[in-house]
Amino acid sequence: MLTAEEWVRQNIILFLHKDLKVPVSHIAVEKGFKVKGLSKRFDIVVFDKKGNIIILIECKSPKIKLNQKSIDQLVIYNLELNASYLMLSNGLKHIFIKYQNGNFEIIDDIPVYSKL
C-alpha cells in the first residue's frame, strides 16, 4: 500500500516522464546527501545528459500545506545540489522555482526536458 507521499512521488514521476519528456534513466528517487554535515534525503531529482542535477523535487502528503517552511527546506537542499529548477508538490498544488545566479524566482511551470 502506498503512503500519501509515495502516491504524490509516483504521480510526479509520471508527470516528469509523460509531460516534460524526461527519460526515466535521468530520474533518481530518494537518495542521501549531506547539507552542512547533516544527512538529508531528496525525494526526486532529474539529471541532464552530463549527469548534473537540473531539477530538485520535494514531495509532501496531500494533507500537508505548502508553505514557506517547505520552500525553505527545498532551498536549503539546493545550496548543496545546485539545481536550476525546484519543484514542491503535495499532489494538489505545485510550486515551481527557477534558480539562477543566486536568485530564486517562482515561475508558472518547468520547461520540457529538451529545453533545459
Model-derived features with residue positions:
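A short, conserved, highly charged catalytic patch centered on acidic carboxylates
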Residues: 1-85, 92-116
